[in-house]
């Protein structure tokens, strides 16, 4: 038995020794390049690691606005997208990515992401012949008028009270607590085509929304936002003077 075990061990050693050099694990060369994370400037890599989780791997289909939507890219200029990417949007799920705002990306990397989004997905003629509402609201909307605008342009999908119909609820407190008024405005203007939500031109055929319509319906939606999203809490968690 001992002799057989020795012969088996020798055979295994011989087999291993016959392996090619390429098949054996080797230490990387001393001069092998190691790229620091801050020096990576490949768009596909940066987008996949920092953007795809919320905005979708191809700029659409994610929980957030589609960065690959040509209509969005036609109304939002590079300075706007850069500011949002660098500094984030307070009180929403959009974090800051720039190092100067507590993120991990350099200014050069943010420029690479913006340039890649623009070159890959923008279409110069996306709004040819159209007159879209401006990205930013020129003036505050009126929630009372907004209720009427909602009834005309939105209720057929989201229900008469906004709590859902063919499409999901648009007055859900948790949703409204996670988006800014600007996000609501942008979504109303550009829609979510991958989810079946039309842009400002196609809610009512032949009657596109005006900038005032958009501002008013956003004001109405914002008025539905709870002061403290997530409440009411269970009475078991409440105590005199506040919430545990």
Please describe what each predicted stretch is.
Residues 1-6:
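Bacterial N-terminal signal peptides that target proteins for export
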Residues 33-37, 44, 60-86, 96, ...:
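Gly/Gly-Pro-rich "capping" loops immediately C-terminal to redox-active cysteine motifs
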Residues 14-17:
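C-terminal motif of bacterial Sec signal peptides marking the signal peptidase cleavage site
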Residues 50-53, 57-61, 65-84, 90-96, ...:
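Intrinsically disordered, glycine/charged-rich N-terminal periplasmic/extracytoplasmic linker segments
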Residues 7-12:
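Hydrophobic alpha-helical targeting segments used for export or membrane insertion
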Residues 19-33, 37, 41, 45-48, ...:
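Flexible coil segments in periplasmic/lumen-exposed cytochrome c-class electron-transfer proteins
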Residues 50, 55-58, 153, 161, ...:
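Conserved functional loop/turn residues at catalytic and ligand-binding sites
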Residues 89-90, 192:
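Calcium-coordinating acidic loop motifs
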């Amino acid at each position: 038995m001992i002799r057989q075990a020795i012969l088996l061990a020798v055979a295994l050693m011989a087999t291993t020794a016959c392996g090619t050099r390429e098949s054996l694990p080797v230490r990387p060369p001393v001069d092998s390049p190691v790229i620091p994370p801050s020096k990576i400037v490949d768009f596909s890599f940066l987008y996949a690691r920092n953007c795809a989780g919320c905005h979708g791997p191809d700029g659409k289909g994610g929980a957030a606005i589609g960065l690959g939507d040509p209509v969005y890219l036609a109304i939002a200029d590079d300075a706007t997208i850069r500011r949002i990417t660098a500094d984030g949007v307070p009180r929403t799920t959009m974090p800051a990515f720039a190092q100067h705002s507590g993120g991990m990306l350099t200014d050069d990397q943010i420029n690479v992401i913006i340039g890649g989004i623009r070159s890959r997905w923008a279409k110069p003629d996306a709004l040819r012949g159209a007159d879209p509402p401006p990205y930013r609201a020129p003036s505050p909307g009126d929630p009372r008028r907004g209720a009427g605008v909602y009834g005309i342009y939105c209720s057929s999908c989201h229900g008469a009270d906004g709590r859902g119909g063919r499409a999901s609820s648009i007055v859900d407190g948790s949703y409204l607590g996670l988006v800014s008024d600007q996000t609501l405005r942008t979504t109303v203007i550009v829609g979510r085509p991958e989810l079946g939500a039309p842009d400002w031109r196609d809610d009512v055929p032949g009657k596109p929304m005006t900038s005032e319509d958009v501002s008013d319906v956003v004001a109405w939606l914002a008025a539905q936002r709870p002061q403290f999203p997530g409440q009411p809490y269970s009475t078991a968690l409440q105590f005199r003077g506040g919430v545990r």
